[in-house]
Amino acid sequence: RWPSREEVEEALKAWLSRHPIPGLLAAGYFGSYARGEAGVGSDLDLLLLVAHSPLPPWKRPLGLSLEELPVPAEALVYTLEEWKGLPQRSPRLARVLREETRWLLPPP
């Protein structure tokens, strides 16, 4: 049996409490789990907003222990400045994230 959205959300909350992320401002998830469409093989798409980061966006998730979550997971990690500029840089992605994201820790 594949984990339900409720099980995954509880595991994500516990994971966030065990792994403090420096400068974390907001945390949520989007995609099939957020839409309530997850099934066997679905992964968890995380969205994390941080105050700032010296790393490029593609390197930021590398230090996260995502393998501890009950389903495969990927993360987008944006600085607040990048998040605010996302609608201009990538309007479609910004719209999807705005409409789908279930926030556990809402953005400021």
Question: How would you describe each model-predicted region?
Answer:
Residues 46-48:
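Short beta-strand->loop micro-motif that forms the acidic, two-metal-ion catalytic signature
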Residues 1-28, 34-41, 50-108:
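Catalytic core of pol beta-like nucleotidyltransferases
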